[in-house]
From Swiss-Prot:
Protein name per the record: Putative transcriptional regulator
Taxonomic lineage from the root: Bacteria, Pseudomonadati, Pseudomonadota, Gammaproteobacteria, Pseudomonadales
Physiological role: Probable transcriptional regulator.
Domain Response regulatory: 3-118
Keywords from the UniProt entry: DNA-binding, Phosphoprotein, Transcription, Transcription regulation, Two-component regulatory system
Pfam (any one): GerE
PROSITE patterns assigned to the protein according to its UniProt record, in alphabetical order: HTH_LUXR_1 (PS00622), HTH_LUXR_2 (PS50043), RESPONSE_REGULATORY (PS50110)
A biological process from GO: regulation of DNA-templated transcription
HTH luxR-type domain: residues covered: 140-205
GO molecular function, one term: DNA binding
Known DNA-binding region: 155-174
Residues the record lists as 4-aspartylphosphate modifications: D9, D53
Length: 207
């Protein structure tokens, strides 16, 4: 069965989570009451799942999530916290967590979330996901606004499948100039490939 690490600075919470998961057949491989200890246990035990409060001492939970991700462990993170989901769920997702459950929820919700996360799904409050999606759309809108008129034109040509040579002929530019525009556009839109540019253009109905 899956191996679980529990990280919370409240012993009663750790005990409740341990009992819940052990009853369901999970193996608890460690507990920690602070971020530094959590990272040590994670390195040593390589748990499948870390159930983590973000309001913990020494190293806060958001930093723990980021460090676990940088360590390239196969540990999925499920946040269990009293913090406001609207404010902290997006931050947890951006840091690398795969789930977020409020301590105000019934503990059975935590078990459902854990199973979803271990199966490869994300589990976040619906309102928080809407907030995350809106933030992403706002960021992309600002990226588009940073493009010059000429860059926007080149983007549309690229997104429609035109080669640098074809674009150069259409716009009476050199291929080198088109290539420079393409590089600038990819940098401004944080796209790492032509496919990424096309996806971006499609999301914003430019093609």
């Amino acid at each position: 069965m899956s191996k679980v690490l529990i990280v919370d600075d409240h012993p009663a919470i750790r005990l409740a989570v341990r009992l819940l998961f052990e009853r369901d057949g999970f193996t608890i491989v460690g507990e920690a009451d602070n971020g530094a200890e959590a990272l040590q246990v994670a390195r040593k035990k390589s748990p499948d799942l870390a159930i983590l409060d973000i309001g913990i001492p020494k190293i806060d939970g958001l930093e723990v999530i980021a460090r676990l991700k940088s360590l390239k462990l196969d540990t999925k993170v499920l946040v269990l916290t009293r913090q406001n989901p609207a404010q902290f769920a997006p931050r947890c997702l951006q840091a690398g967590a795969m789930g977020f459950v409020s301590k105000r929820e019934n503990l059975s919700e935590l078990l459902l979330a854990a199973k979803a996360v271990l199966a490869g799904y994300i589990h976040f409050p619906t309102g928080a996901l809407r907030s995350i999606n809106q933030q992403s759309r706002d960021n992309e809108a600002r990226m588009l606004e940073s493009l010059s008129d000429r860059e926007m034109t080149v983007l549309q040509y690229l997104a429609n499948g035109n080669t640098n040579k074809a674009i150069a002929q259409q716009l009476f530019l050199s291929e080198k100039t088109v290539s420079t525009y393409k590089s600038r556009i990819m940098l401004k839109l944080n796209a790492h490939s032509l496919a990424g540019l096309i996806d971006f253009a499609r999301r914003h109905e430019l093609i």
